[in-house]
Amino acid sequence: MFYNQDVLTKEKGGMGVIWLAATLGSKHSLRKLHKKDIMSVDIDEACDFVAFSPEPLALRLSSNLMIGVTRVWAHQYSFFHSQVSTLHLRVRKELDHFTSKPFKNIDIQNEQTNPKQLLLAEDPAFIPEVSLYDAFNLPSVDLHVDMSSFTQPKENPNISVLETLPDSTSYLINTSQNYSLRNNVSSFVYEDSRAFSTEEPLDFEFDENGDIQELTKGTINSDPSLQAASQHSNLGSVQREYNSEEQESRIHMFEIDEDVLPLPVPLQSVMDSEHNENEPRALKRRKVQKLLEPDENIELSTRTLSQWRKNYVERMIALEATKYVRRRGASSAKKKELNKFFDWESFHPLLKPWIEKLKPSNNTPSEIDDVLRNIDTSEVEVGRDVQGELGLNIPWNTSSRSNSAINSKSHSQTGSEHSTPLLDTKYRKRLPHSPSMPSRVEFLPALESSQFHETLNSELSLQLSDDFVLYKNTQEENAHLMLSMEKECANFYEYAKTAIYENNGRITFSSLLPNDLKRPVVAQAFSHLLSLATKSAFLVKQDKPYSEISVSLNLKSTDAI
């Protein structure tokens, strides 16, 4: 009842998806609905439509829509919960990764850059130790060259050519501390040429012709210049060792003490998850593909077929019993789980008496019958068929409501005892009075069966036997149809009579009805007019074919009323 085929398509809010979610059934069938379709449903509009529908909805339709709304909302909530959980886990992992390694470089690696653009060109005059002197302050350099150091070579041929070079002590640096450059590792040190390569004295020399001559150990020890060079080299090594320790102390001044930094707080949940990820995963069992075994017995013997035919009923009963036991066991297990889940006493002990009051009481059949007998059926609303498009545009049903409401009270008390398929109950109900149909149809004297009608009915009854039934429940359906037609005809009579009185006792058929009516409605009105004319309720006159039809009241029938 109240079923409209367009309610699932014309309404916005995804009513079609809600209907499918309610009627598909199991969770496996719900996988047919895509995530895009479920997320497109507007829950607010759907709830407003179900709660405050613009037109009456069937009970089954409204219940299915409510179930579908809950299922769609549950799916939308599960999608949202999974997204939030995934994002939360990612954020916690990144946070723990950063806190465990505080000095990690988080800059994005640009692999498309050219390494040559990031490297400085090599400069042979660049000395990085210069920037470490006295808190990154360079001393002023004064190169004073003593020309007297460039002496002429002596007559002694044993003197080395290296002795003609100027002394390294002539290159001095004027600073506020009066330090020499050779006293600091970070300065420009022009050492003596005798200690040019290593700290040990050279074991060779150049002669007058430029040839290399090896020197013995005695010559090296006897030469005072070589001994001075060795002493100078030893002094330089000690100074460099001291200066290196001083430089290291200065460098540590700018370093960060790792012991002062706060310890990272590990997130236990994330650590456990990372630990579990590093563990080797357990091997999963491969799904064994089930194959159909070939049937070796291609043919069945006659004896086997006869046994199957004889024991068919017993085998079906046994299979049905097994199926029933299996289902009953599964359903009982599900009921136990539901009872554990919906145990209201576990939430709060004060809810138990309130929930017991809401449970329906188990009444006996006798009590139900007693309750049904005491119901006043005249006040109970019975479902009616929805009026079609033609019924909404019939003018005589609309205009006759005020005239037909006179006898509504008496008709509601008596009612009609015709049964309809809508009254599918154990006890009899009476049809309620419709305001668009008057209850009294006896106002027309010619509606009663005349002598001609009685003769015709007697002749028809002689030709048909008593056991002849053309259709099932024909008498009952014809009685209901005749009652509806008589009420429609009575409504048209009241409508036409009012129009004739307003038009001074006569009116044409074209002016009786509005011009915007459809052709089936006009045909139904003409049928009612001819039916009332045959029963002497109206006087109908037409001068020539296809001309105007004049309608007036029959004064005899009016006086009788």
Curated annotation (Swiss-Prot):
InterPro entries: Rad21/Rec8-like, Rad21/Rec8_C_eu, Rad21_Rec8_N, ScpA-like_C, WH_DNA-bd_sf
Modification comment: Phosphorylated during prophase until after meiosis I.
Low complexity: compositionally biased ranges: 401-412
Gene Ontology CC terms, in alphabetical order: chromatin; cohesin complex; condensed chromosome, centromeric region; meiotic cohesin complex; meiotic spindle; nucleus; pericentric heterochromatin
Keyword Phosphoprotein belongs to the record: yes
A Gene Ontology BP annotation from the UniProt entry: chromatin looping
Keywords: Chromosome, Meiosis, Nucleus, Phosphoprotein
Molecular function per GO: ATP-dependent topological DNA co-entrapment activity; chromatin binding
Compositional bias segments (type: Polar residues): 223-241
Source superkingdom: Eukaryota
Magnesium is among the record's keywords: no
Coiled-coil region list: none
Record-linked Pfam families: Rad21_Rec8, Rad21_Rec8_N
Major site of localization recorded for this protein: nucleus
Location(s), subcellular: Nucleus; Chromosome
Complex formation: Interacts with moa1.
Family the entry assigns: Belongs to the rad21 family.
Function in brief: Involved primarily in the early steps of meiotic recombination. Required to ensure reductional chromosome segregation.
Protein name, entry field: Meiotic recombination protein rec8
